Amino acid sequence: MTLSPEKQHVRPRDAADNDPVAVARGLAEKWRATAVERDRAGGSATAEREDLRASGLLSLLVPREYGGWGADWPTAIEVVREIAAADGSLGHLFGYHLTNAPMIELIGSQEQEEHLYTQIAQNNWWTGNASSENNSHVLDWKVSATPTEDGGYVLNGTKHFCSGAKGSDLLFVFGVVQDDSPQQGAIIAAAIPTSRAGVTPNDDWAAIGMRQTDSGSTDFHNVKVEPDEVLGAPNAFVLAFIQSERGSLFAPIAQLIFANVYLGIAHGALDAAREYTRTQARPWTPAGIQQATEDPYTIRSYGEFTIALQGADAAAREAAHLLQTVWDKGDALTPEDRGELMVKVSGVKALATNAALNISSGVFEVIGARGTHPRYGFDRFWRNVRTHSLHDPVSYKIADVGKHTLNGQYPIPGFTS
């Protein structure tokens, strides 16, 4: 196959013999020390992404027969959460990597699966995404894919919100066929080297949160897509949603990963606030107490935070196990299987979003005014959750659960449902 980016990153030979959750915790402990400073600086988390590359975790979901860890979905979800607890941006980036890579298996050929999974495992490839555009609505795609005589395409246009594209090795991109051929209007998906001539990830990401995710735009100028880089036939991804085929699992996978990024951030906020309350917070004089940890209202707040996380965590883990069950069905997947999973994930997304927003905001009530100083960076937790939780409206997730409970309806399969 033609997919052979120039950069080669040799994977640690014994990586798959380690506990991936323990590896993630070790990295998280290292990153936690610089998280505030890096959030303030923005830009790219280059060194931290190289840490992840060196750890071998980029092949976490790659089957062992291709040289990967062969981890299951519950384990992968735990790893995302551990990373996000230390740094929301890194949890975001790693989560998107885990969302991108399975597309090879979901809509690609057996040959593509073997080749690309092997390359990811052997060379520690980062994957990036280039799917969204900033047009009139979320599916108003204008990046053109012009067919070539050899069965490939030429891409032109600009994608936006391309999390992880910069610094990646393999880029997943969508284009719309815009010519007079029978394919006109069809959506094609492809996995191409990010180093391909004409691909330019831009340094134009600016938001209040997720500052080190490189989620800016990517330009495509006469970018050649080789025939064996095209994943599935034209409209294969769209048809997978319409027919509730295996490719439609992209949505519940992505949404469950997003939810666990939020839960990881919430855990990080709670841990940081607890340490501050124990060591630096001052008691409120009228309360008649000696230490801030004795304040009954503070105690109640920590109880409420913890209870909210207990419920959301339990639901998230249950959904991860259901995802694994559905994933293992392969092509025997039914619309009912897919629907039950999406309803479960929608509930988790709502629980995680609400818990993370409430906790990341509420911690200020238990740390006090001095805790708002920028050197502590407590604001980063809320900013990160608030920024990414706007990816798709959580109200529609709640409505999907309600429609199923009341009317027995499953969510209409789509990129976010």
Curated annotation (Swiss-Prot):
The keyword Oxidoreductase applies. Dibenzothiophene binds at H92, N129, W205. Catalyzes the first step of the '4S' desulfurization pathway that removes covalently bound sulfur from dibenzothiophene (DBT) without breaking carbon-carbon bonds. Sulfur dioxygenase which converts DBT to DBT-sulfone (DBTO2 or DBT 5,5-dioxide) in a stepwise manner. FMN binds at residues 96, 129-134, 159-163, 282, 369-370, 391-392. Changing R370A: Almost no production of DBTO2 from DBT. GO terms for biological process: dibenzothiophene catabolic process; L-leucine catabolic process. Belongs to the DszC flavin monooxygenase family. It catalyses: dibenzothiophene + 2 FMNH2 + 2 O2 = dibenzothiophene 5,5-dioxide + 2 FMN + 2 H2O + 2 H(+); dibenzothiophene + FMNH2 + O2 = dibenzothiophene 5-oxide + FMN + H2O + H(+); dibenzothiophene 5-oxide + FMNH2 + O2 = dibenzothiophene 5,5-dioxide + FMN + H2O + H(+). Pathway: Sulfur metabolism; dibenzothiophene degradation. The lid loop assumes one of 2 conformations allowing opening and closing of the active site; in the 3D structure one dimer is open while the other is closed. Another structure with FMN (3X0Y) proposes a different lid loop that may interact with the loop predicted here. GO terms for cellular component: cytoplasm. It comes from the Bacteria. Keywords: Cytoplasm, Flavoprotein, FMN, Monooxygenase, Nucleotide-binding, Oxidoreductase. SUPFAM superfamilies: Acyl-CoA dehydrogenase C-terminal domain-like, Acyl-CoA dehydrogenase NM domain-like. Homotetramer formed of a dimer of dimers. Residues 280-295 are annotated as: Second lid loop. This is Dibenzothiophene monooxygenase. It is found in: Cytoplasm. Residues 131-142 are annotated as: First lid loop. One of its GO terms (molecular function) is flavin adenine dinucleotide binding.
